[in-house]
Amino acid sequence: MSLYRISARKLSEAQKLPNVGAYVRMIAADGKSLRDVLAAKVPQEQERVKNFRKQHGATKMGETTIDMMYGGMRGIKALVTETSVLDADEGIRFRGLSIPECQKVLPAADGGTEPLPEGLFWLLLTGEVPTKSQVQQLSREWAERAALPQHVVTMLNNMPTTLHPMSQFAAAVTALNHDSKFAKAYSDGVHKSKYWEYVYEDSMDLIAKLPVVAATIYCNTYRGGKGSRSIDSSLDWSANFVKMLGYDNAPFTELMRLYLTIHSDHEGGNVSAHTVHLVGSALSDPYLSFAAGLNGLAGPLHGLANQEVLVWLRKLQKEAGNNPSEEQLKEYIWKTLKSGQVVPGYGHAVLRKTDPRYTCQREFALKHLPEDETFQLVSKIYKVVPPILTETGKVKNPWPNVDAHSGVLLQYYGMKEMNYYTVLFGVSRALGVLASLVWDRALGLPIERPKSFSTDLLVKMVQK
């Protein structure tokens, strides 16, 4: 990979990273659009994957056990996802960069410190760190693409406010496929080598429209339909979202930038990411694929964790007060565990240390709301829970994950409607899964079709 131009500020930041050489090579050449950069990358990556498969296509990557098959395919090495890799000790890496590294090198808004999600999307899609001007260009492009077609506006405005926000969200995204460029191109017989270009266009349109859809749902469901639906082209993606939600608070806008960045991607095996990949492999357009992923995200085992943390915290506060002692906390935690429940927000299927997504939210809280009672309670719990979980001997990871903190921050800034939190998660997750979907089509990945077995057949196989 050739060296790209790098500003003095970026070089200074890069020198703080452990792999300076790799980072410098990742700086995008200023002046090029996202599509230009991606178009140059696609043939290079196609050739690299082609040669890699030619040389190592028969290499075995692991074995599958009966328990893996019955256990949600946990641990089976079966998917290729270019955008992120989850390290058990360091947490998620977006194209090789950890969250702290992303916070250092991705462009922030003027006067802000948190990375702009536009920069993260550029990184996920291209593997390169964009310049600030490129991120600003992307913000403007999304603003230009953001308008909703009238049939979707009408549908949203006629949905019952009692309908769950995620149901409204998935329905609206599905309806947006009326204008899918990929679906039209496929119907017109476009060559498969061009699929990625139309998936890219649909993905850009969809990401641009998501804040408008999500804000409309919020205002209709919780604000009696009041609120702005207008996009300000001078604002970034997150700032426009916050404005349309009806909030006018600079720290909350910074929180939203952080939230939308850190929830964007988490490898390809989680339910929402895998669903988008699976449905997209049938050449369903990005709207249908992402809507399917949203329906997976709506499941309580995937997207409701931060709500469960808040419910648990409220029960704790009701029983032990807002400022319980460590002994009171220990007593309540043991009570939770002995009743057969888990402590929500603690543990992770892959991570074996504190989730860096938790850590960056904690750092945000220490900066912006250090005196908040609920944050202080969360800090006490962070001190008390891990030793107790370790003592039980049943938990591989006793440390907090991203969900242990996010709900508390949203509550602090006035967003108390917990049923809406998964919509925020969905807006963020679009960045990762749609970047992956573009690469699925660029690399020509086929329809997904694993082999399944019945229990009777498995019994016969092991008896041989």
Swiss-Prot record:
It is found in: Mitochondrion matrix. InterPro entries: Citrate_synth-like_lrg_a-sub, Citrate_synth-like_sm_a-sub, Citrate_synthase, Citrate_synthase_AS, Citrate_synthase_euk, Citrate_synthase_sf. GO terms for molecular function: citrate (Si)-synthase activity. It catalyses: oxaloacetate + acetyl-CoA + H2O = citrate + CoA + H(+). Pathway: Carbohydrate metabolism; tricarboxylic acid cycle; isocitrate from oxaloacetate: step 1/2. Its main location: mitochondrion. Belongs to the citrate synthase family. This is Probable citrate synthase, mitochondrial. The gene is Cs1.
